[in-house]
Amino acid sequence: MKSSFNLLINSGSARWIVQRIGGVVIFLYALFILWNLFVNESMSYFEWRQLFESKIVKFFSWVTVFSLISHAWIGMHCVISDYITVRLIGPKALVIRKIFMSTLTVILVVYFLWSALILWGL
């Protein structure tokens, strides 16, 4: 029997909430970047670098990257599970779907780790 935690994180409602929270985070980050562009019109490279060396901006950027990655994973999972089916493709659909999802997962994990390397210098 599955635990209630597994049922919660694998439910459509939980994915919907993650999508919406991620969308809000991405929106707030875009506002933050646009605000900095408009307020500091002649911002130099060194001022941008100084801004992004702030730990809070690094954290906000990393949370935004995580939001983008979770948003992409949930969206692509929905598309792949909707269109790569036995009814549409045939008996090999399950294998093809697993290959697509595994490849997507590897790519998104690499992106997340790469963002950590860029933002935190790890």
Predicted regions and their residues:
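Membrane-embedded alpha-helical bundles that constitute the cytochrome b-like, heme-associated redox core
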Residues: 1-122
